[in-house]
Amino acid sequence: LVGSEMCIRDRNTVGTYIHTYDDRTYEEKKHSILATDIYSAIRGKKYSFIGEGIYEKKFTNSKLSAGIRHQQSLTENKYAGTSSAETRMQEAHTSTYIEYSSKIKRFNYSVGVQGSRSWFNQEGEGYQKYSVLPRIRLTYNFSDQAFIRYQGQISRSTPALSDLSNVEQLIDSLQIRRGNPTLKMSTVYNNTLNVDFRKGLFSSSLYLLYQYQHKPNMEETFREGELFVRTTANQRSWQKLNPEVEIKVGPIKDILSLSISTGINYFDSRGHNYHHTYTNWYYCASATAAYKKWSAYFEIRNHRNDFYGETLSYGENYHLLSVSYRYKQLNVGVMSLNPFGSNYRIGSENFSPLAPSKNWMYIKESSRVFALTLSWNFSFGRKYESAERRLHNEDNNAGTLKSGK
């Protein structure tokens, strides 16, 4: 190792306070007579802290990096209404890693290991887990125009606080949602392969993802008396296979650029009392044109869906068109969302054989929407080169058990 440069690359601390105020009313009527009346009120407070730091030391042809991250939170929730309960949950996650990267001619490699501790407590129940997790990245550059890269990593997935609550919430006259404080962490095996090729105006890439989760925290539905209980448990396994191809051309005559990507999502979800497979084909295409002071952009994509447990979540299906004109530092344009469509919808479908359901949200206002855009670019004073932001920590999980479907 010849020559070195040492620095603390990034530091980031975030403190969060989340106040939950959630009321829900549900009624069922039969021949105008009230048959079911459910009211739930949730009041909650969550305090959390996240701190992270990254250290790097660069050598002539290699780099050594290390980091540490700590997250801790306290959550207090009160449930009132048709059913009442109080919860007080504490959790902490600490992880540290070390990674070494280098290159040998056309071959680049990176190996690392992460050590972590996860802890959760709710009225004496919970878990404490220590883990040692490896990761690797291998890249081979065939030339300046083509390369192949493999990345592999083992990680842990912690249960959501909302699923760990020792609480029950009525959904309707036949269903109840129940938390599970005995949930344990699951193991995630992640593998990705990238192949890129570029020549002239043409570029293409092949992406392949395979992910396997062992004992994932997935939903479970069973019958208890006259009610169907929806809860979360450590199930058997979950797998995802995702090949994707992207092709780009341009800019043609420094005016037109075209891009299209398409892929398949295949899911295999295995629970203790269910097994589902699902395949989804998706695409996204876009075109960008720029001539003198005019520019235009068009994008279209279909549903890219996700399947987890027994629930199919539908992605967005939309198209977008925009045209703009630039005069000095002023940019004026018009944009339209779904100008050639009649309706916009997103939703989900549950395939439980005991209590299947469908949920759709229709937003007609999101079709044939037109908007004017206006921007003014200005700068003054000294200019500084901005550094890449590598750390982005946030906590947006309130830790409350939802009562809706």
Provide a role label for each language-model segment.
Residues 38-50, 89, 178-180, 184, ...:
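Outer membrane beta-barrel strand-and-loop segments of large Gram-negative receptors
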Residues 1-8:
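Short, small-residue-biased leader/transition segments that mark boundaries at the very start
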Residues 13-21, 66-72, 111-117, 150-154, ...:
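Transmembrane beta-barrel strands of outer-membrane/channel proteins
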Residues 325-405:
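C-terminal beta-signal and adjacent terminal beta-strands/loops
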Residues 22-32, 76-85, 121-130, 161-169, ...:
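Outer-membrane beta-barrel translocator domains and adjoining extracellular loop/strand segments
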Residues 144-146, 156-205, 212, 230-242, ...:
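Outer-membrane beta-barrel signature, preferentially recognizing the C-terminal barrel domain
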Residues 4, 51-57, 96-102, 136-140, ...:
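Residues on the lipid-exposed face of transmembrane beta-strands in outer-membrane beta-barrel proteins
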Residues 65-73, 90-125, 129-137, 255-259, ...:
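Surface-exposed extracellular loop regions of Gram-negative outer-membrane beta-barrel proteins
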